[in-house]
């Protein structure tokens, strides 16, 4: 398909880039913890992302377009194949002079349930079954950021593209740690009577690696949507989808 970035010499990609003023490189084969746990060690997952990056970065080089490459805070986790792939992407982006950002657990409405992240997953479970059955014990902590805050940050960076220092770490994060159990409790409060069932196992995708985000980006941007408000918005958006 012409929409498949894993295809070499994709004519549609070349045309779209040629017609663009600026490129946000967010495309990736990725999903939530459940998806990564099952896929990130598989050949196809690694191949999908390696090819997607090679051909897209080559097209960016050929068209010489300004761009932001969206990496992940998991690029700092050496045990993660997904993180290692993002590190390769960062090297590509650096070689071409683009901006590199690291996202921290961005959430919003999702339509592909196979790849859904924890907040969407918990809302769907609470709404449809009245039970939030977790895949971990919920003690792991995350920094959650609403997609609207993330989008505002990316736009700000694009607008200031030429003045953003390339040697700074740009971590797009909320700055607030919350456990997965806290998220479940917020969501169960939106659906009275919902039961929370933690599992016995610990998180083995990020292994609860509490590396704090670099604060530099706060000089040009601040998130404004609190977690509870953001979760309520996602719930309303999911109701509208139905």
Residue ranges and their predicted role:
Residues 2, 28, 72, 103-106:
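Active-site loop/turn elements of alpha/beta-hydrolase fold enzymes
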Residues 48-55, 66, 88-89, 146-149:
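Conserved cofactor-binding/catalytic machinery of classical short-chain dehydrogenase/reductase
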Residues 126-242:
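C-terminal substrate-binding subdomain of Rossmann-fold SDR/epimerase-dehydratase oxidoreductases
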């Amino acid at each position: 398909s012409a929409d498949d970035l894993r295809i070499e010499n994709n004519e549609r990609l070349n045309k779209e880039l040629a017609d663009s003023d600026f490129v946000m490189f967010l495309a990736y084969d990725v999903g939530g913890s459940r998806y990564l746990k099952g896929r990130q060690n598989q050949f196809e997952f690694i191949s999908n992302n390696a090819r997607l990056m090679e051909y897209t970065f080559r097209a960016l080089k050929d068209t010489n377009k300004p761009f932001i490459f969206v990496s992940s805070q998991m690029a700092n986790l050496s045990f993660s194949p997904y993180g290692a792939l993002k590190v390769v992407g960062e090297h590509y982006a650096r070689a071409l002079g683009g901006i590199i950002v690291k996202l921290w657990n961005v959430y919003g409405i999702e339509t592909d349930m196979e790849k859904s992240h924890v907040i969407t997953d918990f809302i769907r479970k609470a709404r449809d079954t009245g039970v939030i059955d977790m895949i971990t014990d919920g003690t792991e902590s995350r920094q959650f950021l609403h997609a609207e805050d993330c989008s505002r940050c990316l736009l700000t960076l694009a607008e200031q593209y030429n003045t953003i220092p390339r040697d700074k770490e740009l971590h797009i994060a909320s700055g607030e740690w919350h456990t997965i159990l806290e998220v479940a409790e917020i969501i169960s409060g939106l659906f009275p009577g919902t039961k929370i069932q933690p599992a016995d196992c610990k998180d083995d995708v990020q292994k609860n690696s509490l590396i704090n985000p670099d604060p530099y980006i706060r000089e040009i941007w601040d998130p404004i949507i609190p977690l509870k408000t953001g979760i309520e918005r996602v719930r309303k958006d999911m109701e509208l989808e139905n």
